[in-house]
């Protein structure tokens, strides 16, 4: 009988120790980042956009862009951007910060192929404060076939958004996809958004008798 009591006491003691270890391990797990934060960092986000160019005395064309982002990683593909019938593929690193003055910056490196062939360091960046937004993207194409084809591309916007779904402002562009008398084209823009869709109209060189029109549509998913 005394032997059974001894065995029973030993079992109770072991169970108590095991239970104590289980409780002690609980708070350790709560110190790790919540699964939702980790999942957010691992999520992919995508966007697709198409810009239709209506150029006086020149060929009209569509310029599509597709992006994919996951945490710091930025991937992008463009067509008819650096030149007509020319594509480019990009790899970039996302940075962001700020609260009232929020900023994003993505340095990138791309390969260009088609009518123009080369490599291109580039960037995308934005600043937003109150209802104002500044966006700019640029690249310097190093033409591996002909160094005279080296060129600096840029697209920049300064906008005001009086309400969440409406923005308007100024735009500038420097491109070789089509030729004009102006090295840097200047214009006006107005854009609308609905949920994950956006639509924007641009008028470049509005002081000319026949300005260049650009109609853009985009989607995020």
Summary of predicted features, one role per range:
Residues 1-42, 221:
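Cleavable N-terminal export/targeting peptides
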């Amino acid at each position: 009988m005394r032997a059974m009591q001894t065995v029973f006491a030993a079992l109770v003691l072991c169970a108590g120790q095991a239970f104590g270890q289980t409780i002690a391990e609980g708070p350790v797990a709560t110190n790790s980042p919540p699964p939702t934060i980790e999942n957010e960092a691992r999520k992919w986000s995508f966007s697709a956009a198409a810009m239709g160019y209506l150029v006086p005395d020149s060929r009209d064309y569509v310029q599509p862009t597709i992006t994919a982002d996951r945490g710091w990683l930025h991937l992008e593909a463009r067509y008819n951007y650096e030149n007509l019938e020319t594509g480019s593929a990009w790899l970039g690193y996302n940075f962001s910060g700020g609260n009232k003055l929020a900023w994003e910056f993505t340095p990138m490196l791309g390969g260009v192929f088609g009518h123009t062939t080369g490599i291109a360091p580039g960037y995308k960046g934005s600043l937003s404060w109150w209802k104002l937004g500044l966006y700019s993207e640029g690249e310097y194409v190093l033409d591996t076939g002909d160094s005279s084809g080296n060129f600096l591309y840029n697209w920049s916007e300064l906008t005001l958004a009086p309400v969440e779904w409406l923005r308007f402002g100024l735009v500038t562009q420097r491109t070789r996809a089509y030729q004009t008398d102006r090295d840097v084209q200047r214009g006006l823009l107005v854009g609308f958004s609905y949920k994950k869709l956006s639509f924007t109209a641009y008028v470049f060189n509005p002081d000319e008798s026949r300005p260049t029109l650009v109609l853009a549509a985009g989607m995020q998913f």
